[in-house]
Amino acid sequence: MASHHEITDHKHGEMDIRHQQATFAGFIKGATWVSILSIAVLVFLALANS
């Protein structure tokens, strides 16, 4: 039975990763904002409680 997938040799560094890089950059930006907001809320709560 014939295979429907062509088997090729892997060549390191030839894959287009622009979408993965953009997704990772967005994730890092979002994680940074969530961290900053969380710290700001904690500081506000600490100051409001004192």
UniProtKB/Swiss-Prot annotation:
Membrane-protein topology: Single-pass membrane protein
Listed GO MF terms: cytochrome-c oxidase activity
Cytoplasmic domain ranges by topology: 2-17
Highest taxon above the source species: Bacteria
Broad class of the protein's primary localization: membrane
Periplasmic side: 50
Keywords: Cell inner membrane, Cell membrane, Membrane, Translocase, Transmembrane, Transmembrane helix
Transmembrane segments: 18-49
Reaction catalyzed: 4 Fe(II)-[cytochrome c] + O2 + 8 H(+)(in) = 4 Fe(III)-[cytochrome c] + 2 H2O + 4 H(+)(out)
Cellular compartment(s): Cell inner membrane
EC numbers on record: 7.1.1.9
Gene Ontology CC, one term: plasma membrane
Purpose: Not required for enzymatic activity or proton pumping of the cytochrome c oxidase complex.
Record's protein name: Cytochrome c oxidase subunit 4
Record organism: Paracoccus denitrificans
